[in-house]
Amino acid sequence: MSDNIRRSMPLFPIGIVMQLTELSARQIRYYEENGLIFPARSEGNRRLFSFHDVDKLLEIKHLIEQGVNMAGIKQILAKAEAEPEQKQNEKTKKPMKHDLSDDELRQLLKNELMQAGRFQRGNTFRQGDMSRFFH
């Protein structure tokens, strides 16, 4: 089981999260109502928080202590969540980019032209092959 999966498993009830974060239940529910955290629900409809949720609550608490308002917190958290996606996109793009040598480029172009020629003709005969049948 990967570390990311473990950290996102809903384990903690609100009482434990209150002790870990030193936030009140009302504050935690308020952050949920404002879409800052998304705790899972148990079968009895009780909130269950993951390590990620606790980390996010601690980050929210730190931002509030610095004087950041709710709109600012939402922007900061949205930006922080978008950055890993951008980094992942950059990682997938980088392996595709590499400099081709002149010989590799010629071979690639030659193969593409040959493929294009096959599809444009629609048959496997060369022009010279057809002329034998008509002379």
From Swiss-Prot:
GO terms for molecular function: DNA binding; DNA-binding transcription factor activity; identical protein binding. Residues 80-101 are annotated as: Disordered. GO terms for biological process: negative regulation of DNA-templated transcription. The keyword Transcription regulation applies. InterPro entries: DNA-bd_dom_put_sf (IPR009061), MerR-type_HTH_dom (IPR000551), MerR_fam (IPR047057). Changing M96V: In strain: PCI 219. The keyword Acyltransferase does not apply. Under conditions of nitrogen excess, the DNA binding activity of GlnR is activated by a transient interaction with feedback-inhibited GlnA. Under conditions of nitrogen-limited, GlnR is autoinhibited by its C-terminal region. Keywords: DNA-binding, Repressor, Transcription, Transcription regulation. Induction: Under conditions of nitrogen-limited growth, repressed by TnrA. SUPFAM superfamilies: Putative DNA-binding domain (SSF46955). Residues 11-79 form the HTH merR-type domain. Coiled coil: none annotated. Disruption phenotype: In vivo, this mutant constitutively represses glnR expression. In vitro, this mutant binds DNA more tightly than wild-type and this binding is not activated by feedback-inhibited GlnA. Residues 14-33 bind DNA. PANTHER family: HTH-TYPE TRANSCRIPTIONAL REGULATOR TNRA, REDOX-CYCLING DRUG-SENSING TRANSCRIPTIONAL ACTIVATOR SOXR. Homodimer under conditions of nitrogen excess. Monomer under conditions of nitrogen-limited. Interacts with feedback-inhibited GlnA in order to stabilizes GlnR-DNA complex. Transcription repressor that represses many genes including ureABC and tnrA, during nitrogen excess. On the contrary of the MerR members, which require longer DNA sites for high-affinity binding, GlnR requires a DNA sequence of 17 nucleotides as minimal binding site. The amino acid sequences of the N-terminal DNA binding domains of TnrA and GlnR are highly similar, and both proteins bind to DNA sequences with a common consensus sequence. In contrast, the C-terminal signal transduction domains of TnrA and GlnR have no homology. This is HTH-type transcriptional regulator GlnR. It comes from Bacillus subtilis (strain 168). The gene is glnR.
